[in-house]
């Protein structure tokens, strides 16, 4: 049954983050999701991963893979289905003005940061990488810029010391889904307000790539620990041993001094100081990083305690990791 004050919505999204918002809209909302546009099928090791394709199928929503469509095709479809509003969540492509102009209420975007900080495609990961203590969700009225539109709603979210991109994303989904429902109600009632962003405070969250996940031991232990959490569950921080890629799923910063392990004043970053059941202690550009959860190529994720039972020779003290 269609609610008398429901909106006809087209949903644009690609990631699991988007899929959870679609799930909430389709499951709890009185609004009609007429069509879903997505870039491509995605997979993830995150336990909370949700497929946007499965959600569309479950709720019998027409799904279009936009990489196989031209802009003119998308424009034609949007006009034909006669939507009131386009909702964009983690879509990954910029919508041209021709599409933004079609819905009578325009297009809104649910973004995983406190805009204008961390505009761009990887706001959750960059907030963790740079050691932010707080982030949040911002819903904006879209314009042609990258996350530059006026703010409809904004809500903060604390970042905890052991948060990964996966755990932080899970909390942001809950916040974003609730906020989206509120904003849609405001559109129906005509009670929404728009607040311009102050671009002098803007930062940009560049897209992640696999190569930046390679551990640079010249960075500080604090920086590396942040990167390991930021790049979990993708692309996963890694280093090399014997031509094997070793992925690092968890680590912590040691409060011990290098002098506790060696009297040398010229230890190379990447040098293993000790390999204990509780972790592998590695010299960095500043401080010691303790590796606690690792994964050898083709093997399961395992604790260092279990790993050393079979690969102790790989982690001898004074050897240098690549």
From Swiss-Prot:
Statement: the UniProt record of this protein carries the keyword Protein biosynthesis: yes
Residues reported to bind (6S)-5,6,7,8-tetrahydrofolate: 113-116
InterPro entries reported for this sequence: Fmt (IPR005794), Formyl_trans_C (IPR005793), Formyl_trans_C_sf (IPR037022), Formyl_transf_N (IPR002376), Formyl_transf_N_sf (IPR036477), Formyl_transferase-like_C_sf (IPR011034), Met-tRNA-FMT_C (IPR044135), Met-tRNA-FMT_N (IPR041711)
Keyword set, alphabetical order: Protein biosynthesis, Transferase
The enzyme's E.C. designation: 2.1.2.9
GO molecular function: methionyl-tRNA formyltransferase activity
GO cellular component labels: cytosol
Catalyzed reactions per annotation: L-methionyl-tRNA(fMet) + (6R)-10-formyltetrahydrofolate = N-formyl-L-methionyl-tRNA(fMet) + (6S)-5,6,7,8-tetrahydrofolate + H(+)
EC top class named in words: transferase
Family: Belongs to the Fmt family.
Function: Attaches a formyl group to the free amino group of methionyl-tRNA(fMet). The formyl group appears to play a dual role in the initiator identity of N-formylmethionyl-tRNA by promoting its recognition by IF2 and preventing the misappropriation of this tRNA by the elongation apparatus.
Name of protein: Methionyl-tRNA formyltransferase
Organism of derivation: Blochmanniella pennsylvanica (strain BPEN)
